[in-house]
Amino acid sequence: MVKAISSNLGYPRLGEKREWKRALEKFWNGAISEEELLAETKALRLHALKKQQEKGIDLIPVGDFSFYDQVLDTSVTFGIIPKRFQHDGGKVSLNTYFDIARGKSDAVASEMTKWFNTNYHYIVPELADADPKVLDNRALYYYEEAKKELGIEGKPVLVGPVTYLKLGKGNDAENFEALLDKFIPAYVEILKELERAGAKWVQIDEPYLATSFDKSEIKLFEKVYQAFQTAVPNLKIELQTYFESLDYYEEVVNLPVAAIGIDFVHDHGDSLEALKAHGFPEDKYLAAGVIDGRNVWRSDLDAKLSLLTEIADYVTDGKLIVQPSNSLLHVPVTKLSEPDLDEVILGGLSFADQKLDEIAILTKALTDGAESVTAELEDARAAVTALNESSHRNNLEVQEAIANLGNVRVDRELPFAERIKLQHAWLNLPLFPTTTIGSFPQSPEVRKTRADWLKGNITDAEYNAFIEKETARWIKIQEELDIDVLVHGEFERTDMVEYFGQKLAGFQATKFGWVQSYGSRAVRPPLIYGDVAFTEEITVKESVYAQSLTKRPVKGMLTAPVTIINWSFVRDDVPESVVANQVGLALRKEVEALERNGIKVIQVDEPALREGLPLKQARWEKYLNDAVYSFKLTTASVQNDTQIHTHMCYSDFDDIIDTISALDADVISIETSRSHGEIISTFEEVTYDKEIGLGVYDIHSPRVPTVTEIQDNIRRALRAIDAKQFWINPDCGLKTRKEPETIAALQDMIKATKEVRAEYQVLEK
C-alpha cells in the first residue's frame, strides 16, 4: 500500500444551474447591485468548496474562482490595465474589470483568445510598458475566506509568471527576460502574504511547460522558481503542468519546488515513459493527473489504479498526489442533474463532482488497499463495460462505411479558378459582397418560446410558426440593410454544435451539462457516445423557407466535423479521426440535401480548427491532414456552381495558412477585429488564391463600431487582399448581441462598405 494525497486543480464556476452566469448578467443589466453580485457569487464559491471538503479532497483549490477569467484576474492583481481604460492606479473596480473584458463606448475590449487547445477563452494581457504592482491579492482573500467560513486549509491557485507573460501581447522575445524580472518581485509579494497568512501549499499553473519551446527557455523557470524558493522556503509550491507531456522532463522535475504536477491523460503515454527512464526526485511530491479533466467519460478505475501503482514505484512514500489532469473548469458540475438520460449512457458519465469521487476512490485504494473500495471499483467496471459493449456504441452500417472510405470522392470536380467563374455568373454580386456569419440575436422572446416548446407548453405547430415569423422578420431586416448574401438567423438553434447533436445518431444532449466558454457565455457540449449517422434532414426546412422569402441568395449553415468534435465531449474508445469521418459522412448527406432543395451557397463552419491543434508541433501534421480530409468529405460532392463558405474565429493563422487553402472552400471568413487586425499581416506575407472575408468589427462587445473604424479595417485588409477576392462581414455570429446594437452595427458596416466600394469603382474607371 502507498500513502497518497487527494487533490483538485480547479472547480467549475458556473454553478449547477448556471447561477454564476445569471448573477453576472443581472449585474451587467443593472438588475442587481455590486453588493448583491458579491453575495450571490460568494454563496456559489462556498458551496463548491464545501462539496470538495465533503468528498474528502485533501488539497482543495482556492482562488480558482473568477468573475470572468483567471488570466484577467492576474492582470488586475498586478495593475496591468490598458491605458484606454483610464485606471487611476488603485485597486481595480469591478466595473473597470468588466470593461476590459467587454469594452465600453470609448474603449475597445482587450483581445480574447483560446486557452491553449481548449474551448475556454482568456483575456489577453497587454504588456507594453507593464509596471507590475500588487493592487489586489485575490489569492489571499479567497484563502482567508475559505479558512474563516469553512475551516478549509485551501491551496491558492495562481497563473504562473512565465505562462502569463507568454500569453500576453507586447512580450517580444528580446526583452522577455527583462519583463519577467519586473514580475518576479510582485509574485514574491503575493507569496509572502500567503505564507504570513498561514498557507501551506500554493498551486502555480505553468501549462506553457507542456508546449513546444526552445530548451534555452528552461532558464526562465529556473530563475523564477529559485527566486520563489529563496523568498518563501516554507511554502510548498506545486508547479502544475497540463494538457500534454513535458519535452524537458528532467529539467522540469528538478526545478526548486515542492511538487510537480504532470498530466498522465493527454500525454500520449510520454509521461510514464519519462518517469521510467529518468526517475523522480526523492524530496518532491509528484501530483499525478490521472483523471481526465477535459472529458466526461467515467474512468476505468482498474486501469487508473494500475497506472498509479506503477507511478508510485518511482515516488517517495507519502509524496504521491492523486488529481485530475487539469482544472475541472472544462467539464459540467454534476451528472446528478441528468436523471432523464439513458441509464447506460448516464452510468458511463463522470462530471466534475463524480471526478472528485473517482479521485477519492483511487486515493483510498492506494492508501488502504483496493479491497477497501471493492464495491466502488466493481461499479465503475460494470458501467464502463456496459457502455462499450452496448448497441449505443456500435452501428455496423457506419463502421462498414468508414472501412470503405477509399471509394468516396473527397475533391471538388473542378479546381477553384474554374468553378468560381460559374459561381460568379449566377450570383452576380457587387464588389465587396456583404454577408453575416450566421446567427442573429436570440431575444428573450426567442428563448422563452423555445423553453415553452421544450416544456410542452406550446405545440410543434405554434413553435414552428414562431420560428418562421422570426426568420421572415430578419430576412426583411437584411434586405432593408441591403446585405448581399443572407442567412436565416438560426433561431431554431441553441448552439451551433448542440443543434446538430440533437439530429444525428450517436449524439446525446444534456439538460445541465454547461461549461464556460468566455465570460458569462456557457455552452452545452453534446455527448458523442457512439457511432455517428445521418438520420433526418437537419437544416433544410429552415433554409428553404428563408430562401422562399427573398431573391437574394440565402446561405445554408452547417458546423464542420472538427468543430463538432472539439466542441463536444467525444467518446474515448476510438480515435477522434474516426469520429470526425463519421460526422463528415453524415454531414455530406445534409449538404447534398440542401443543394437538392435549391440552396446553392452553403457555409460549413470550422471555427475550432486552430484551437484543436496539438500543443506539440510534432503532432500537427496528422491533426491537420485529418481535419482537411473530414472537411472535404463533407463538402466535395456538390456541383461546381455551388459555393462553399467556411468560417473560423479567435485564431492565429500564419502557421496553418496552407491547411486553410487545402480545405478548398470557395470563401472563408475569419475573425479579425478582436485580434486588432493582426491576422491581416498573414495575408500580407502570403498569396491566398480563394475569396476571403476578414471580420470588420468585433461582435463580442456590445459596443457599436463607427463607420470610420470599419472603413479603416476594410482599407487595411485591402492592402493585403485583392479587392475582387474580398468579402465584408462581422467577426462572428450575432446570437449573443441585442437587436438594436446589431442593426446599428450592420448599418455602419453597410454604409462603410458602400463608401469604400464607390471609391474603388471610381479608381477602376
Curated annotation (Swiss-Prot):
Binding site for L-methionine: I437, G438, S439, E490, D605
Cofactor binding description: Binds 1 zinc ion per subunit.
GO BP annotations listed: methionine biosynthetic process; methylation
Pfam families recorded: Meth_synt_1 (PF08267), Meth_synt_2 (PF01717)
Catalytic activity: 5-methyltetrahydropteroyltri-L-glutamate + L-homocysteine = tetrahydropteroyltri-L-glutamate + L-methionine
Stretches assigned to coiled coil: none
Record: residues binding Zn(2+): H647, C649, E671, C732
UniProt binding sites for L-homocysteine: I437, G438, S439, E490, D605
The protein's Enzyme Commission number: 2.1.1.14
Pathway: Amino-acid biosynthesis; L-methionine biosynthesis via de novo pathway; L-methionine from L-homocysteine (MetE route): step 1/1
InterPro entries named among the record's database cross-references: Cbl-indep_Met_Synth_N, Cobalamin-indep_Met_synthase, Met_Synth_C/arc, UROD/MetE-like_sf
Family indicated by similarity: Belongs to the vitamin-B12 independent methionine synthase family.
Binding-site positions, 5-methyltetrahydropteroyltri-L-glutamate: R18, E19, W20, K21, K114, W567, E611
Originating species: Listeria monocytogenes serovar 1/2a (strain ATCC BAA-679 / EGD-e)
Cofactors: Zn(2+)
GO MF annotation list: 5-methyltetrahydropteroyltriglutamate-homocysteine S-methyltransferase activity; zinc ion binding
Keywords: Amino-acid biosynthesis, Metal-binding, Methionine biosynthesis, Methyltransferase, Repeat, Transferase, Zinc
Taxonomy, superkingdom: Bacteria
This protein's name: 5-methyltetrahydropteroyltriglutamate--homocysteine methyltransferase
Claim: tRNA-binding is one of the keywords in the record: no
Protein's job: Catalyzes the transfer of a methyl group from 5-methyltetrahydrofolate to homocysteine resulting in methionine formation.
Active-site residue numbers: H700 (proton donor)
